[in-house]
Each structure stands twice: as structure tokens, then as C-alpha cells.
Amino acid sequence: MPLSEVAGHSVKGLFSLHGATLITRVLHALQQAGVRRIAVVGSELLLHALPSLDAEMLFAVEGSDPVDNLLRGVERLGLPSEAQFLHCAVDLPMLTGSALCDLIHAAPPDADVVVGWTPESAFVQMFPGAPYTALRFAEGRFLTASASVMRVGFLEAQLPLLRRLAAARKSAGKVALTLLRAFHYHLATTGMPLAARFFTGRLALASLPPIAQRLLGARLHLYLNAAPELAYDIDTDEDYRYAQAWLQAHSRYTL
């Protein structure tokens, strides 16, 4: 059955889980994390469903792709190139303020982009029996977090690469091939060895920041203890059903 039929709506942010929509859950978590200004980028249907919060909320209609949405949010907030901002997906049903705080506090002031990774062991412990996909690295198995910290200047400077990565984001293999093409000038020395290590699970996450600095001029920081709540998103009806049951069994996540 299509996800929209199971969830009762075609707009993810308006999926209802245990009495609250996804957009309401995420916005409350952002406020609990101390975020004072929030740009919501999405369907106009979301505009009429925004909860009343103490935080200042701004709205922008969604663009053609996720990167366009980031640009619209940054523009709506009026952020300068040197500013860092927190990006958070809307389909995080178990999101908490503390999970976001951990990510925010882990972001070095000089980082251009902070990417969160959740250890598989922590995810499975919190969400036993949940559907998920983990990637294997030299440091172990991890899930990607659906929240990140980014500098506006990095977003502006890396638009072509970020658009290609956004288009490939649902497939680890496609992401790897996208990066391989991006490093074509260093194919023999960096691209091919990097891809080989990735596909065999031998790639060390710790090796990526120096590569990003050398090839992109970007300061990449990897946070390898991102909370499981940041890694559970909803892409399938199975994801939705599990989240609904999990929230019903954990009353402290009730808004």
C-alpha cells in the first residue's frame, strides 16, 4: 500500500503519529533545543498547519529539489555567508530537543558542514525490530542522521555537487559514484581508492575530513554519536507503522 494511503496524507509533514503531525513534532523539538528562528520550507498546506510556538517562524514555498529548499530557507532567514545553520528533515517522528542539542553542541565553530552518523548498535537498542539501512565503514556500521549543520558559504560554493548528491541520496552506491565523478581530477590518487574502500566496507570515516579539505576546500566534521532519533525517518509504510506503534508504547514522546 502506498505510504500516503497508510499515513492518510500526501504531504509528509502532515502525517499524523500518535496525535501530532510530523511538522508539529519537529518544530517542538527545535524549540526545545533552543532554536529561536525557524524557516519552514514546504508545501503551502504546511503553512496552515503550523503550531503556535515561542520561536519565530518564517515560511517559504518549497523549490525544485532539497538543495533549492535549503537556499530558500537561508534566504528567508537572511543569513550571511559566514553563518552556520541547522538543517532538519521533517520526517523524524521520534525527534527530541536533546538529540538536536547534542548535534548542535558537537558542531565546531569553524566547520563548514557537520554530518551526523548514528552507530547501528545504538539505533537497534532504541528501536528494536525497526526497518533500517546501515553502511559499513572501518569504524563500524552507521546510519546517516537526517539533520546537519552547514555554513551558508559552503552551500553557495558547492551547489552543483550538493544537487547531484541530493538526487542520489536514497542510494549509497549512487552517492559513492557521484563523489567519484566529483573527484575525477584526482581519480587515480583519490577517487578510485576511495570508492574501492567504500564498497568493501574498509573506508575510514576519519579519512574523509582531510580529503574534503584538500579537494573541496571545506572543513568537514563528522559526529559519530548522533542520537538514534536523528536517524529514524519515514520513507515507507513499514517505517510509518513502526513509528506509530513505537510512539504509542513510549508516552514520554507524546506532545
Please give the residue ranges for each predicted region.
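Short amphipathic alpha-helices within nucleic acid-binding modules
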Residues: 240-246
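Residues at the starts of beta-strands that form the adenosine-phosphate
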Residues: 36-38, 84, 112
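N-terminal glycine-rich phosphate-binding loop and ensuing alpha1 helix
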Residues: 1-45
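Short, conserved phosphate/pyrophosphate- and ester-handling motifs at nucleotide-, phospho-/glycolipid
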Residues: 236
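Short beta-strand/turn micro-motifs composed of small residues
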Residues: 41-44, 89, 117
